[in-house]
Amino acid sequence: MSFIQANLIHLLAACWFVICWGGYTRYASWKGRDTACLASVLHLYREDWMRRMLLRDNRIADASVIGNLERNASFFASSTLIILAGILTVLGASERAVSLLADIPMVQQASQGMSEIKLLCLAMVFVYAFFTFSWCMRQYNFAAVLVGSAPMIGERHVSEQERKAFAARAARVISMAANQFNFGLRSYYFGMTMLAWFVSPWLFMLMSAGVVLVLYRREFHSDVLDVMVYTPTEAPIPEANKEAA
């Protein structure tokens, strides 16, 4: 029996994993163009943020916010390197790791070659996560440069149209960085599902589909999205104020 025939269900599970991850990424990008979602709504808030920044002389708070966002990406990039080091350590002692997994009752036994492929796939997911978070950090650096080069209020030679264009560009750069951060988080979510692959390929496929459902609900139907798109109505005038009027 060939390697493919012996591990057909594992290979099908890996293909299903790629379809779930890549398919949801494409779907979320397509649906977000004409549907309110976290990414599109936050981009509108970033545009408001940049327009209001141009009305302030002191931009320390704006630079601080971008710095905090960059540190979040830096934390995940550093954590990813630690995870990769652990995966490579296990890969170096794969024979012992396979024997330890075989002692767990719920774990479906697999060959050493298949177990090494699983570890390599898991490592590839977190390599992608590292490059994504590092690119996110660089884009936040670009955003910090844009904030530093923003025109001041007293610069009369800068037209209103140029200010609006600058605010749109700066908001777009920040949104691009946030999208990369989102892609990195997704790689963590899907990377966690690969742990189920060591238990059972069926559980792996189920967990992959479950992560897609969780991501979809959070992106398009979460409570925080409802709060951000909510537009409050005009507050009623108190009775005392009506009598005074």
Where are these predicted regions, by residue range?
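Juxtamembrane "helix exit" motif at the C-terminal ends of alpha-helical transmembrane segments
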Residues: 1-2, 83-108, 197-216
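Membrane-interface amphipathic/juxtamembrane segments adjacent to transmembrane helices
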Residues: 28-69
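Transmembrane alpha-helical segments and their cytosolic interface motifs
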Residues: 64-88, 115, 176-207
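Alpha-helical transmembrane segments of helical membrane proteins, especially in multi-pass transport
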Residues: 128-197
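Hydrophobic alpha-helical membrane-embedded segments
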Residues: 10-38, 74-88, 119-142, 189
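Membrane-proximal helix-loop-helix units in multi-pass membrane proteins
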Residues: 96-111, 116-153
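Cytosolic/matrix-facing juxtamembrane and C-terminal tails of multi-pass cellular membrane proteins
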Residues: 3, 148-157, 162-171, 218-245
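Hydrophobic alpha-helical transmembrane segments
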Residues: 4-15, 106-122, 201-206
